[in-house]
C-alpha cells in the first residue's frame, strides 16, 4: 500500500528549479533563530514549520524538533533519564515536558512554549491556552476557549494567538450529547498582552469548516467551506454514493472572511460556488474551476483569471506562494510525468518534469526552506 509522507528537508530556495527532487539539507550561513515564525500544516495541524526547524507531535503526543541544518529529529525534552512516555489511560499525568494531548501542535514564541488543547480532560467543548517555559516546564493555563471542540490550525503573530476551530455536536449543561449533527466553525483570537479572547461569527450548515487562516495588520482572513443551507446530511450521503466529486463541486460553497480584531467585526468578502481547492495564500484566495484558475484579491474584492493553461491537465498537489511567485504542478492526461511551474507577473516558467513515481507536492515554503510531501 502506498503511503503519503512529508519530507522534512531544507532547500536553498533559489535552487528549487533543479534540486528539489532529492533530499538535501543545506546550511544558510545568515540564518537567525531569534525571530522564528511558524506556519501550521494543512495536512497535519500538529506540525508547525519554520525556516530553521519543524515542531511536531508523534503518535504518542510527544513533541519533536527537526533541525533543518543537521537533519536531526530530537525529542523536545532536556529532563535527565526521562522515558518520554505520553498521555494514556495508565499515565494520565506524564512527567515528560514534551508530552501533550490535543489536536494542535506546540509552538515556540517570544521565548515561551505555547499549546492549545485540553490536557485535563474536563470538557470536550473547552480548550485552553497553555503557556510554559521554553523547555516545556512550568505549564499554566491562561486563556479559556469555550464551545471549541476541534482546533484546526493555529498561528502566532503580532502577540496574538489566532486559531481555527470546528464543532460537530451539541451538549447540554451536564455534558451529554443532545445533537450529534450540529456542524459549525469559526476563528478565535487570544491577545497575549491580557489573554482576552475574541471570537468571530460562526459559519454553519453541513460540513462547515475553516480551511486556511492568515493575519495582517490587525485583521484575520480565513477561507471556509460548507454545503448550502438546503443540502441535508441524507443528500450528502446519497451524493457521495453516486459521484462524490461532482456532488461537492455542484453544492459546496467556498467563502473568504475578514475578522477585524479591534472592532470585533466579521465580514464575508465573497462566497463562491462551482470551484475546486480554494487556498488562502498571503491573504488572497486562489482557486480553480472548469473555466480555469483565478485569484480573489481581498483588498480590492476583485477576481481575475490567471494565465495558467490547464486544458487536458490535472493539478498535482496544492498551489503555493512565496513572495511574488506562485508555484503549481500539472500532469497531462495519459502521461506519467508531472510538470512544475512558477508564475510571476502573469508569466509562467517551467521549472522541471518528474515521473509520477518521483513527483511531490509542496507542503510549505518558509523563507529559504521548502518542505515537500511525497508518496512511496
Question: How would you describe each model-predicted region?
Answer:
Residues 1-15, 24:
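N-terminal Sec-pathway targeting helices
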Residues 67-71, 133-137, 191-195, 260-264, ...:
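Short loop/turn segments that connect beta-strands within beta-propeller blades
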Residues 56-58, 114-117, 162-165, 221-224, ...:
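Residue position within the beta-strands of beta-propeller blades
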Residues 33-40, 74-77, 81-97, 138-144, ...:
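A short beta-strand motif characteristic of beta-propeller blades
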Residues 20-36:
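Sec-dependent signal peptide cleavage junction
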Residues 118-123, 165-182, 225-251:
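Short, conserved, GDST-rich strand-edge loop motifs in beta-rich repeat architectures
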Residues 38-50, 85-107, 147-158, 205-217, ...:
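Repeated scaffold domains used in trafficking and secretory/extracellular systems
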Residues 62-64, 128-130, 186-188, 255-257, ...:
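A short loop-to-beta-strand structural motif that recurs across blades of beta-propeller domains
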